[in-house]
Curated annotation (Swiss-Prot):
Residue ranges annotated as propeptide in the record: 19-31
Protein name (database record): Probable endopolygalacturonase II
PANTHER family: ENDOPOLYGALACTURONASE B, POLYGALACTURONASE
Similarity comment text for this entry: Belongs to the glycosyl hydrolase 28 family.
Signal peptide: 1-18
Length: 369
């Protein structure tokens, strides 16, 4: 098991050598004591930076606009109240954007953030058809906590994280309505260019990856419940500005009625690095494609069957991945380039049902296929 380190929020701070002016002290006092309740997205976006407590009450975000809280005051608490809804327009989004330091983002009892994604769903996701807005950006956020959000029916990807030292706890993303209504590419959490991301107690019902880690380090996903999607994924890695995934632990989670259980995928012909990866105590049921799949052959979003070696996958621990898969599914599939997968440790892998694969290549010692 690899060490997992996050900077404690209590340790974050800076020392100011010069005493603030009287006017600066007055401004700080006003911000620390101000609670602002907004019922308008534009007002919240324009003036919330002056508030230490932001309440977003039954906001209806106009079509084609972002509920933009990227300039939130340091240390602010942001609370969703009632139902947050969004007008319909074909555009890229995001529908919500956060930014800032030492934020606490939460909701009141019974609140829901409802994307009403069925207006966009057409079974094509981001691959064509209607242009669908991304849902929530947690970008340029540092030393912050997001907890207890209830998110429903996102048009496509739900939460995009590009952040440093953030805690996302007890978040529910429920896109189960998309199962029969054309939901596609409705990823739960997409993580990239991040250091220190802790996701605990998430519930994700969707039609794509429960979590997808494309780049970043010191990432933990634990206590998750994932159903309907593509499983617990790293990648695809490659083809971006940052193509390193390091020190990731995914543990104590369940994956049900999904295409895959555990998945690592890298892009053919690209360069990067995937290392220090642990999957521990993952329970599977109703898996339709692969219980465990690790492959170095992705190109244009699909596997090719021909691996490359530019993104090595090293120091991988798979411990206690158990459960059942469907009759036509494959228990384990490993497709590595020559020498580009190494230092793997597997124990307690017990997947029943389905088939074994005869197409694995370059399986490193310590693993089995």
């Amino acid at each position: 098991m690899h060490s997992f380190q996050l900077l404690g929020l209590a340790a974050v701070g800076s020392v100011v050598s010069a005493a603030p002016t009287a006017s600066r002290v007055s401004d700080l006092v006003k911000k620390s004591s101000s609670t602002c309740t907004f019922t308008s997205a534009s007002e919240a976006s324009e003036t919330s930076s002056s508030c230490s407590n932001v309440v977003l009450s039954n906001i209806e975000v106009p079509a084609g606009e972002t509920l933009d809280l990227s300039d939130a005051a340091d240390g602010a608490t942001i609370t969703f109240e009632g139902t947050t809804s969004f007008g319909y327009e074909e555009w890229d989004g995001p529908l919500i954007r956060f930014g800032g330091k030492q934020l606490t983002i939460t909701q009141s009892d019974g609140a829901v953030i409802d994307g009403d994604g069925s207006r966009w769903w057409d079974s094509e996701g981001t691959n064509g058809g209607k242009t669908k807005p991304k849902f929530m950006y947690v970008h340029d956020v540092e030393d912050s906590t997001i907890k207890g959000l209830q998110i429903k029916n996102t048009p496509v990807q739900a939460i995009s994280v590009q952040a440093t030292n953030v805690y996302l706890t007890d978040i529910t993303i429920d896109n189960s309505d998309g199962d029969d209504n054309g939901g596609h590419n409705t990823d739960g959490f997409d993580i990239s260019e991040s250091t220190g991301v802790y996701i605990s107690g998430a519930t994700v019902k969707n039609q794509d990856d429960c979590i997808a880690i494309n780049s970043g380090e010191n990432i933990l996903f634990t206590g998750g419940t994932c159903s309907g999607g593509h499983g617990l994924s790293i990648g695809s890695v490659g083809g971006r500005d940052d193509n390193t995934v390091k020190n990731v632990t995914i543990s104590d989670s369940t994956v049900t009625d999904s295409a895959n259980g555990v998945r690592i995928k890298t892009i053919y012909g690209d360069t990067g690095d995937v290392s220090e990866i642990t999957y521990s105590n993952i329970q599977l049921s109703g898996i339709t494609d692969y219980g465990i799949v690790i492959e170095q052959d992705y190109e244009n979003g699909s596997p090719t069957g021909t691996p490359s070696t530019g993104v090595p996958i090293t120091d991988v621990t798979v411990d206690g991945v158990t459960g059942s898969i469907e009759d036509d599914a494959v228990q384990v599939y490993i497709l590595c380039g020559d020498g580009s997968c190494s230092d793997w440790t597997w124990s307690g892998v017990d997947i029943t049902g389905g088939e074994t694969s005869s197409d694995c290549e370059n399986v490193p010692s310590g693993a089995s296929c």
